[in-house]
Swiss-Prot record:
Catalytic activity entry: (R)-pantoate + beta-alanine + ATP = (R)-pantothenate + AMP + diphosphate + H(+)
EC number(s) from the headed UniProt entry: 6.3.2.1
Functional pathway: Cofactor biosynthesis; (R)-pantothenate biosynthesis; (R)-pantothenate from (R)-pantoate and beta-alanine: step 1/1
Localization, UniProt: Cytoplasm
Name by which UniProt lists this protein: Pantothenate synthetase
Residues holding (R)-pantoate: 57, 149
HAMAP family named in the record: PanC
Enzyme class: ligase
Length: 274
């Protein structure tokens, strides 16, 4: 696996490499990330990963400096997964001057996760566009676990006419249904036992809608009540349209149920397509 930090070296390394599939990460990799690398192989000739902890997407109450940096272990995992090229820029490489030009997503950045993490999706969209310009891939993989992020990137790519196919990678789960996340490591043993409740409740919402329930607000409120009774502190449980995460206009269009809630001090997110 080649490792490059400079944009010029990266572009030189990617000449004549066929169809390039790009998987951006912030490092601290787990099996969910590695699954994206494996899925990417089926969509192109060359798989490029990136590791960059992006300061722009951290909010005022989110500690950029405490984000785990596990670079050597990440490199070993990526090489074992068959990644061809790793782009690992420093802040000076990617932001050689203050980033005064940014990507401002529309209203989607202010709902759901965006309501609780103001400015987050502006930072995500800006760094992803910049990484796209560095790598110049033909396709890019983003996990469906971060569903709102996937929609922001997919819609940005379409509206800015970027020649990149955005592919949603399926969420990898533990045997009990908990979505794999670096945050799971912060759960106590008791919290880890409780954590799959979030996915079970999303499954119950999907089952109810498929069985004919049309009152999505009632389903949301029932799930919130169940989480609260079990000691969770909820940000949201929401049923939305898949395409743009707007409020559902009936239950016949493709929908997604999404949730974000805190178990102890750990904020967990999950979703399920309906």
């Amino acid at each position: 696996m080649q490792i490059h930090s400079s944009i010029a070296d990266l572009r030189s390394a990617l000449k004549n490499r066929g169809r390039v599939v790009f998987v951006p990460t912030m490092g601290n990799l787990h099996a969910g990330h590695i699954s994206l690398m494996t899925q990417a192989r089926a969509h192109g000739d060359t798989v490029v990963a990136s590791i960059f902890v992006n300061r722009l997407q951290f909010g005022p109450n989110e500690d950029f400096d405490k984000y785990p940096r596990t670079f050597q272990a990440d490199c070993d995992k990526l090489a074992a997964a068959g990644v061809d090229v790793l782009f690992a820029p420093t802040e000076a490489d990617l932001y050689p001057e203050p980033q005064e030009y940014t990507v401002e997503p529309p209203a989607i950045q202010n709902i759901l996760d965006g309501e609780f993490r103001p400015g987050h999706f502006r930072g995500v969209a800006t760094v992803v566009l910049k990484l796209f310009n560095c790598v110049q891939p033909q396709a890019a993989m983003f996990g469906k676990k971060d569903y709102q992020q996937l929609m922001v990137i997919r819609n940005m790519t379409r509206q800015l006419a970027l020649p990149i196919d955005i592919i949603g990678g399926e969420t990898v789960r533990a045997e009990d249904g908990l979505a794999l996340s670096s945050r799971n490591g912060y759960l106590s043993a008791a919290e880890r036992t409780e954590a799959p409740r979030l996915y079970r409740l999303l499954n119950e919402i999907r089952a109810a809608i498929r069985a004919g329930e049309t009152d999505t607000v009632k389903l949301e409120n029932e799930a919130i009540a169940a989480l609260t009774a079990a000691g969770w502190k909820n940000d949201y449980v929401a049923v939305r349209q898949q395409s743009d995460l707007s409020m559902p206009k009936g239950v016949n269009a493709p929908l997604v149920a999404l949730a974000a809630s805190r178990l102890g001090s750990t904020r967990l997110i999950d979703n399920i397509e309906i």
